[in-house]
């Protein structure tokens, strides 16, 4: 709904994953889903990270901590930088096998980890504000110093 009606949207972690699934289903017409929910979709656009597949005992095994993202597009403008460090807590990622198809229809990967190549941010630049991040910007935000994503998201709603 937000994408179609150009309503500002900020997808955080699982929210980013769901906006990718929605885009793949509605725009690309795929039977798309996330491996986190179930794996009987024809197109798993969200998959478990390779280094998480052998984890048998959960607890402290996620991709945790601060990671760098190299930025471009609107996200780079929002942060006023070409690189940012944000904190993470997840096991699933955008399946890189689908990036070209998503980007061809307008969902751009606008932030990527330089070491792993993982997609950290996605966006649709033609929209008022349509950004997803695999990170948790709330971990680096306070009343005195709000994370730029929150600041710009709220501005876009006014």
Which residue stretches match the model-derived regions?
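Conserved active-site segments centered on acidic
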Residues: 19, 24
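Amide-donor transfer/coupling interface in amidating biosynthetic enzymes
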Residues: 1-7, 12, 25-158
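Active-site loop->helix "elbow" adjoining a glycine-rich segment at hydrolase catalytic centers
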Residues: 14-16
